[in-house]
Amino acid sequence: VLQSEGLIRIQPRSGILIVKPDLALLRNAFQLREVLEVPAFRHMAGTMPRDALQAIEARHQELLDRSAGLEVTSEVAETVSAFDQAFHFDAVRFLSNPLLQRAHEQAFDCIRLIRLDQLYMLSASAIARTMQEHLAVVRACLARDPDAAVAALELHFARAMQRALGV
């Protein structure tokens, strides 16, 4: 898939060449995520069982509480990245549409490539900010306020895009 999207080139006997991603690719990937995730979080805000939302909130709060003074090792970074990805993937999965899920995974792949290229460094403060942003989305869903959930999600995307660029 990455090769068909022009993100990598496989060179015989030389290996894989990662094509340098640019700002346009990042913007396009986040725009695709927004198109897919906005209806997902709207749907969650209206229909996800309260206990499921409370469990999501509790997991985020636990990670936020642990992030203070956390030494971010490669293992911690992988765990947090997987946690972040699961939050977004689970929202899209809640729509029960495999086509949307595949498109969403592809957008995430683009963002991961850009983070690699930008030498994206995950810090304890970045983890805390991300968890706070996620909590704002989850709490809006708990309040059954889809507009607030979308507003919090859009703010999260704007900040996540800045973090991916190292700004």
Question: Could you say what each language-model-derived stretch is?
Answer:
Residues 18, 29, 33, 80, ...:
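Residue-level marker of regulatory loop/turn positions in helix-turn-helix DNA-binding domains and
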